[in-house]
Amino acid sequence: MRVKMHVKKGDTVLVASGKYKGRVGKVKEVLPKKYAVIVEGVNIVKKAVRVSPKYPQGGFIEKEAPLHASKVRPICPACGKPTRVRKKFLENGKKIRVCAKCGGALDTEE
């Protein structure tokens, strides 16, 4: 089953609820099967790693953990506010994401 996501990699988002409410960051990765996103600088966890060629010291590393996608809202580049996403069809048949508040496009046209 394909899950429709309202955010894409590279979007600037606001965390709307939870422990990190109010924080703004860029989406590093989208995980549609888990309906989750990894946001830069948000939901930092400490992970124990064994000694390996990648981590010669071992010990603990800090990394971003996935955040449920319903907790984030994309920030509209036109109005600068966090918004819900609507879809709109263009004349050429392409579907783009649109800001629900101002109607500005969230996708850059290729």
UniProtKB/Swiss-Prot annotation:
Keywords: Ribonucleoprotein, Ribosomal protein, RNA-binding, rRNA-binding. SMART domains: KOW. It comes from the Bacteria. Coiled coil: none annotated. GO terms for cellular component: ribonucleoprotein complex; ribosome. Pfam families: KOW (PF00467), ribosomal_L24 (PF17136). GO terms for biological process: translation. The keyword Transmembrane does not apply. InterPro entries: KOW, Rib_uL2_dom2, Ribosomal_uL24, Ribosomal_uL24_CS, Ribosomal_uL24_KOW, Translation_prot_SH3-like_sf. PANTHER family: MITOCHONDRIAL RIBOSOMAL PROTEIN L24. Belongs to the universal ribosomal protein uL24 family. One of two assembly initiator proteins, it binds directly to the 5'-end of the 23S rRNA, where it nucleates assembly of the 50S subunit. One of the proteins that surrounds the polypeptide exit tunnel on the outside of the subunit. NCBIfam families: rplX_bact. This is Large ribosomal subunit protein uL24. The lineage of its organism: Bacteria, Thermotogati, Deinococcota, Deinococci, Thermales.
